[in-house]
Amino acid sequence: MKNQITIREAITEADIAVFWGQLHTYHMRDIFPDSEDENRKHFLDDTEYRAQIQRVHDRQQDRCYYLFFHRNGQDIGFALPAIFTSEDGKCFILEFCVFPAFRGSGTGRTCADALLSWAKMRGARYAELNYGGDERRLRFWKRVGFVENGADEWGEPLMLLPPADPVPFTVEVLEDPDDWQLRKLENGFKREIGEDVLTS
């Protein structure tokens, strides 16, 4: 079907190399344009960020996926989601990009919808992401249906696409003061009441 956006996984060595090349370009162009930004150095260092992501990609359960958005015979963007089926079915969108030449005319929204449908077919019940505090990204994800959802353990703002269906939940006692889930809850509360978030 012409103009239909599909998702294809980068599986071959060549596809994975292209994926990481595009991800590095995205980080330099869109996320960390300041070449002196310490975060940029971390995300472009294959011994740090890539090695960490590769470990998540290679595990048997709750893994991440290197994906391309594909339309009319060419890749038009990419995504890096992780689906936690052993937990509560969360799809965490680590990275999402529509290549600049293909932005506009609702392409980003269509890619986001395709990604969320793809994730649902693989067991995702809801989605979450970090939008980095960028107002443009905040507006985009709100149009997709996400709502602001506190902050992560590093104080970065999160967004949540609530589940369409009821999600079973469990209760457990979190006793470790360094537990990331406690930090996330505390940061979400502090952010809501206008206080500085806790950082590691």
Name each model-derived stretch:
Residues 5-89, 94, 99, 112, ...:
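Acetyl-CoA-dependent GNAT
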Residues 92, 123-125, 145:
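Short loop/turn motifs at secondary-structure junctions
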Residues 95-104, 131-132:
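A short, internal acetyl-CoA/4′-phosphopantetheine-binding micro-motif in the GNAT/acyltransferase core
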Residues 110-126:
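Conserved acyl-CoA
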Residues 128-138, 155-156:
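Conserved beta-strand-loop-alpha-helix junction that forms the acyl-donor binding cleft
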Residues 142-151:
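Conserved acetyl-CoA-binding loop of GNAT-fold acetyltransferases
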Residues 164-170:
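Short, charged/polar, Gly/Pro-enriched secondary-structure boundary elements
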